[in-house]
């Protein structure tokens, strides 16, 4: 904390300098008519704005002549001074140009995330007014940097995808590998893609009611079947982190921001502490690359009149995201709602223009997901809601340091969060200071106000029902207390609302950097008019100085949240009984009971299944979310344990011989029949003697096959 505070001092000083640069009044720029206007770039290069205004002047002059009977009207874009040698530019409506000429720089439309929706709504002729981005080598370098950062985060897993696991996620790593395996098994066997009986046999698991990422598992099924679920998990994590950053970079470039600004914003969205934290075992919260694409498609609805096509594409994208992760989509929708309300206050959002496309998108998506959603809430093994203990962020976590960040104290960080996969805040002091300066300096931009409000509201929601400071309740109610019992929202962990602040803060940084580059560019051009002898290299350096200073300030603010590699520990070895073909002689269509039974803290049997021909046999119980067996159909983690499972759990915990009574033996045999168990398997490892000897009192002496003890219990079902 002290180190972060010390670092915040130079950040604050540099931010003050940057604020002075950005707040300087820009020099007037002369138009072709001799009048002056204060130009604020809104996603267009200066040359394109000048050309558009010149064409507008020509049209006005020609039409004046026509009114006097001295000439014919001139179409927009036919200005004789424009010879067409430059790259073609989008048509700019006259209303847009007129609005630009009647505004000051401070009042001009923002050039960032919501630029498309905050400019004049509806391009003429249905033409897309977002700048078309031609990707070049510089863009590929940015994406390569994102891939390199993702490799750095996962570096301890490289070369150990099947022998190591992300241990700070407890068993989440294995759980998601199992989900990828289940999707591949369903594809290979033409089974229901929304259900699997490969764990919790014979009841099975409702995949739609779990974070099963079928939207990635199904298309990646060939990879899983060819190389295994371990490889699929690594690929999804790697491309999820890098792809999310690259998608936001693309989104910001689509809004017209310069490359350095978009690169910094994209990096923060892809590698914020929350993203790195979820990389410990939550690929559904790592693979967020569709969210900026969906947002871009929403903004396109304000730019052109192809509502049907854009609406259909929007619906398809939303549908895909639902199958990847519903909760991230819900969080984005809340963020869009907050930003939209602020823009509506400023009258910078035309809901009537967007409504047809949004309605079409909603209809397409609802048509495609109606049955899956019915299955999720009313199908086999569905449940209503699941109880979570208070899961709000500690207030100190908002400016604290995450576990996997450079120079942090892991124990101090751990004390401020639920667990290592839910460090959803931890933005650091310097980033908050810089964001505050940006909001103050650029406060007249509606999009800056909207992003600032979004960051505050998201973090306020993330505090839960009551503000807690360093583990001590303050008695101050938080915003979440107003919404925690609403349908759907009741299942959301409030700590995750802080993730909505990530793109908000990234947008603020990107807008400020872009403004710095454009501010220095305009001043450089003004200087060129009075200094014709200036060398091109010196001029280019001078024009971009403020922009690179802004990048440096942002880098200083991001330094405390630079990620370190995730912790990887060795997996328990898979018995050769499963890596070879021996298991086939003991599996005959029923289940295998792993001892101790699989649950949220011991999912080693998942590795057995994945090693044996990708879930070729089902197992008893498991790690999933399912119904609790009560009339209210509430949810719970894992299966409702039968007496035999509870007994094995107690024996394993006590590590002492326990002799079963006659009544217990009868009950345990009934449990095995209910599970339709073929074989009970106990691997040979340390501390198995108590379990083995206790099982002897229930099932008799086992057979030793390679490196496991096995009991054939098929006879109990006859």
Question: What do the PLM-derived regions correspond to, one by one?
Answer:
Residues 337, 361-366, 507, 511-561:
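Signature aromatic-anchored transmembrane alpha helix within multi-pass, membrane-resident enzymes
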Residues 346-358, 435-477, 524-534, 540-544:
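Membrane-interface helix-loop-helix junctions at transmembrane boundaries of multi-pass membrane enzymes
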Residues 166, 278-285, 415-416, 423, ...:
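Membrane-helix boundary/interfacial segments in multi-pass membrane proteins
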Residues 146, 237-255, 260-345, 357-373, ...:
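Membrane-embedded helix bundles of polyisoprenyl
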Residues 167-186, 354-357, 361-439, 485-498:
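Periplasmic/ER-lumenal interhelical loops and adjacent helix-loop junctions
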Residues 148-244, 272-288, 395-412, 469-471, ...:
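Membrane-interface coil-to-helix junctions
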Residues 552-718:
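Extracytoplasmic
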Residues 90, 94-96, 106-111, 118-157, ...:
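Start-transfer (signal-anchor) and selected internal transmembrane alpha helices
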């Amino acid at each position: 904390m002290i180190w972060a505070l010390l670092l915040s001092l130079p950040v604050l000083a540099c931010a003050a300098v940057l604020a002075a640069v950005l707040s300087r009044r820009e020099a007037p720029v002369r138009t072709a008519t001799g009048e002056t206007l204060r130009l604020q770039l809104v996603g267009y290069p200066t040359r394109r704005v000048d050309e558009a205004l010149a064409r507008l002047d020509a049209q006005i002059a020609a039409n004046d002549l026509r009114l006097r009977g001295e000439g014919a009207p001139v179409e927009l874009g036919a200005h004789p001074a424009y010879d067409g040698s430059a790259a073609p530019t989008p048509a700019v409506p006259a209303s847009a140009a007129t609005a630009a000429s009647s505004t000051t720089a401070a009042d001009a439309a923002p050039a960032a995330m919501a630029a498309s929706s905050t400019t004049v709504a509806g391009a003429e002729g249905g033409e897309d007014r977002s700048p078309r981005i031609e990707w070049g080598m510089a863009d590929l370098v940015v994406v390569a940097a994102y891939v390199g950062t993702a490799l750095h985060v996962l570096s301890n897993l490289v070369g150990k995808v099947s022998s190591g696991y992300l241990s700070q996620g407890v068993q989440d790593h294995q759980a998601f590998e199992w989900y990828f395996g289940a999707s591949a098994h369903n594809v290979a066997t033409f089974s229901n893609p929304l259900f699997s009986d490969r764990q919790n046999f014979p009841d099975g698991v409702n995949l739609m009611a779990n974070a099963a990422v079928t939207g990635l598992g199904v298309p990646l099924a060939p990879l899983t079947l060819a190389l295994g679920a371990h490889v699929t998990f690594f690929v999804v994590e790697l491309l999820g982190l890098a792809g999310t950053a690259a998608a936001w970079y693309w989104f910001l470039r689509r809004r017209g921001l310069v490359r350095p600004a978009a690169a910094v914003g994209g990096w923060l969205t892809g590698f914020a502490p929350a993203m790195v934290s979820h990389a410990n075992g939550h690929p559904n919260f790592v693979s967020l690359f569709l969210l900026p694409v969906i947002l871009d498609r929403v903004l396109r609805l304000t730019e052109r009149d192809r509502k049907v096509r854009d609406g259909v594409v929007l619906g398809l994208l939303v549908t895909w995201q639902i199958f990847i992760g519903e909760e991230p989509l819900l969080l984005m929708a809340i963020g869009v709602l907050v930003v939209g309300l602020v823009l509506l206050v400023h009258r910078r959002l035309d809901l009537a223009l967007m409504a047809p496309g949004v309605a079409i998108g909603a209809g397409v998506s609802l048509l495609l997901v109606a049955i899956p959603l019915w299955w999720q809430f009313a199908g086999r093994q569905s449940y209503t809601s699941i109880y979570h203990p208070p899961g709000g962020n500690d207030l100190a976590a908002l400016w604290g340091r995450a576990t996997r960040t450079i120079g942090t104290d892991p124990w101090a960080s751990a004390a401020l969060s639920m667990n290592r996969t839910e460090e959803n805040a931890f933005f650091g002091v310097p980033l908050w200071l810089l964001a505050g300066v940006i909001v103050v300096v650029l406060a007249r931009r509606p999009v800056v106000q909207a992003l600032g409000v979004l960051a505050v509201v998201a973090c306020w929601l993330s505090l839960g029902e009551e503000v807690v400071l360093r583990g001590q309740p303050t008695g101050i109610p938080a915003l979440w207390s107003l919404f925690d019992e609403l349908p759907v929202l009741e299942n959301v962990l409030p700590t995750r609302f802080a993730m909505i602040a990530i793109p908000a803060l990234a947008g603020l940084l990107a807008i400020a950097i872009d403004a710095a580059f454009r501010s220095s560019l305009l001043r450089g051009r003004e200087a060129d008019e009075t200094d014709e002898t200036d060398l091109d290299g010196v001029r280019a350096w001078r024009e971009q100085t403020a922009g690179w200073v802004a990048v440096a300030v942002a880098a200083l603010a991001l330094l405390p949240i630079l990620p370190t590699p995730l912790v990887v520990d060795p997996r328990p070895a898979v018995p050769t009984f499963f890596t070879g073909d021996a298991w086939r002689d003991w599996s005959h269509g029923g289940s295998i009971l792993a001892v101790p039974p699989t649950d949220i803290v011991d999912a080693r049997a998942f590795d057995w299944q994945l090693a044996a021909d990708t879930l070729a046999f089902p197992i008893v119980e498991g790690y999933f979310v399912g119904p609790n067996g009560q009339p209210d159909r509430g949810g719970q983690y894992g299966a409702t344990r039968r007496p035999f499972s509870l007994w094995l759990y107690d024996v394993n915990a006590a590590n002492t011989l326990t002799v079963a009574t006659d009544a217990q033996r009868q009950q345990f045999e009934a449990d095995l029949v209910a599970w339709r168990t073929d074989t009970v398997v106990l691997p040979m490892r340390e501390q198995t003697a108590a379990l083995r000897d206790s099982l002897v009192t229930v099932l008799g002496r086992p057979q030793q096959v390679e490196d496991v003890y096995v009991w054939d219990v098929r006879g109990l079902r006859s």
